[in-house]
């Protein structure tokens, strides 16, 4: 490895040949791992946004692109006729069911793309998080060490030098693969020209950090059913002060702030008088449908019983009429005049 290159784990050769059925998957996983820092740039232009924002056409475009890029067997489109939000809900088992020959690879590729999108937001080449000045116990950097021309390329606004070791230690808790590559022992050896080249290649893709972030008002487009709304909030880490996963694999989640969650749901439904009591009545409706259940002996702890893929299928069948009936019944109760005893 030349000095200044980012460390990428090599794929060690193995003496024994894998079973025939694993050749395609092994080759594709190796290609995914070797995408490296430019991986997100390989995607077609429209697909470089967050996967949860993909349209139905984008999902099918991604499917065809993945098949061509990684020589995957052709997958039937009817298994992926959904938007990006629904695609991100699918589990690995759902992918295997819809694409038996390549479901594992497609699932891992989607997770990789989502991870790379997060890395581009707060990665070390875009200045944002690493330029924050926070109190540290490290000695201040002498002025003569920060006046060099390699500190910042003002024409592009990209950081052309690794972050200060003090800042690296302060932000060590962030769970980001892009940050994990920056270790104090390798900061001095990074090739600044390589960093500048990478910043230039990803400049068009990552211009979005300068845009204001969407407000946390609880409004989610095209999301009418309560179970869908709850799941979308769980997928967005900005709403963790209100609701969060306790065990994502087991689909167990906790309502952290009941009143705050009710306000979000009320804002989404344009009902200013929404309370958690009213919202929980609608939530209990899903107990009867075996979609959500309350964890026994636990307060504000719930579990999704059906896989998200199954719920997406049910959304256009019997689930919406039942939801509408339940919502009408709740609204009727809310509108009944109070009678004094």
Swiss-Prot record:
Region (Disordered): 315-341
Name of one Pfam family that matches: Ets
Signal peptide, first to last residue: none
InterPro entries in the cross-refs: Ets_dom (IPR000418), ETS_fam (IPR046328), Pointed_dom (IPR003118), SAM/pointed_sf (IPR013761), WH-like_DNA-bd_sf (IPR036388), WH_DNA-bd_sf (IPR036390)
Domain of life the protein comes from: Eukaryota
DNA-binding residues: 224-305
Family: Belongs to the ETS family.
Protein name as catalogued: Transcription factor ETV7
Protein's organism: Homo sapiens
Gene from which this protein is expressed: ETV7
């Amino acid at each position: 490895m030349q000095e200044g290159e980012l460390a990428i784990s090599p794929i060690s050769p193995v003496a024994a040949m894998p079973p025939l059925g694993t050749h395609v998957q092994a080759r594709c996983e190796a290609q995914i791992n070797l995408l490296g820092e430019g991986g997100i740039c390989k995607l077609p232009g429209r697909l470089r946004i967050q996967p949860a924002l993909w349209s139905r056409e984008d999902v099918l475009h991604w499917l065809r692109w993945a098949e061509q890029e990684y020589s995957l067997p052709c997958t039937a489109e009817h298994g992926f006729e959904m938007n990006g939000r629904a695609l991100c809900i699918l589990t690995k088992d759902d992918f295997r069911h819809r694409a038996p020959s390549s479901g594992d690879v497609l699932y891992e590729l989607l997770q990789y793309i989502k991870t790379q999108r997060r890395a581009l937001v707060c990665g070390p080449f875009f200045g944002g998080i690493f330029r924050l000045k926070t109190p540290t116990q490290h000695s201040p950097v002498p002025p003569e060490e920060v006046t060099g021309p390699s500190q910042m390329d003002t024409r592009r606004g990209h950081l052309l030098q690794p972050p200060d070791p003090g800042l690296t230690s302060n932000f060590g808790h962030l769970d980001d693969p892009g940050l994990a590559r920056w270790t104090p022992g390798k900061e001095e050896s990074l090739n600044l020209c390589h960093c500048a080249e990478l910043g230039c290649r990803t400049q068009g893709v990552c211009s979005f950090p300068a845009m204001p972030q969407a407000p946390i008002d609880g409004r989610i487009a095209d999301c009418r059913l309560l179970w869908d709304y709850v799941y979308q909030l769980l997928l967005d880490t900005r709403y963790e002060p209100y609701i969060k996963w306790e065990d994502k694999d087991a689909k167990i989640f906790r309502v952290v702030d009941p009143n705050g969650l009710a306000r979000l749901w009320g804002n989404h439904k344009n009902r200013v008088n929404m309370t958690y009591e009213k919202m929980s009545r609608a939530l209990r409706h899903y107990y009867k449908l075996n979609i959500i259940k309350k964890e026994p002996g636990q307060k504000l702890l719930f579990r999704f019983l059906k896989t998200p893929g199954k719920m997406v299928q049910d959304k256009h069948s019997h689930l919406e009429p039942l939801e509408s009936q339940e919502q009408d019944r709740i609204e009727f109760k809310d509108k009944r005049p109070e009678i004094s005893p």
